[in-house]
């Protein structure tokens, strides 16, 4: 969870602008990870429509929290975040029917880009950890960190994955044991990659899209891995970026135009090349070296897709149990 939200329209989209008071603008609240893609696409959207995009970035739970606090004075037009936070937003009546790629408005949010939970390890860490049990090794004391379940999408995914792989109580017990090595709650998942790259950390959590994009752009000295369970199986969680139109959007028409634009085939086709994401659209197939890197990263990994509505229904109990198990 970021300690502060940065409210700034992407420079290419016309500056910080006039926000919700400008009828020719649209305000997006988004979890971090897609910033470079947004910069390119928001600029193209502004050139095409004349609508300025004001962009607010934060942790997955933080952008939702901001929207909740602004309920009496809505500023947000579009929310983009990871599960289960988009489901929580829907449950709290913060979202309106949102058009999907087929033009249907049966749901209040749509998948914008596919993504998957991952761990990252420094390229100089030897021997490289391969299993969840390896991460309990004392050599990782104060050299391991993960984002906070209940506040970060990737951190929440890690909790759910461990309970899925090990069993509900066993997963909690594991996280309790992992506290001996854990540095503590970070500002956000996005803050962890640079720490691993610099050697301040040996291991951290991340996701495939964010990690591969950073490795390519910054030559970050870490690599993606998926720890194996006791049975030797490597498993990840499908963790899409979801997008929904705000129920009280100050610029509902502009929000609809931006959603249509981002879900269009030409824009969806840029996900892999520009930011190592893949499209949820059945009629968009990623190709090229970036798509190959995504496929290679996930080779041999079992992808688990939780019932996010069910997760949301027991969200508070899950986080309470986590806090109790880890003494937080």
Residue ranges and their predicted role:
Residues 29-39, 60-64, 68, 74-201, ...:
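Extracytoplasmic ligand-binding site segments that recognize negatively charged/polar headgroups
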Residues 246-302:
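Mature extracytoplasmic/periplasmic domains
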Residues 14-17:
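Bacterial signal peptide processing site
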Residues 31-54, 214:
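Short, polar/charged alpha-helical segment
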Residues 8-12:
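C-terminal motif of bacterial Sec signal peptides marking the signal peptidase cleavage site
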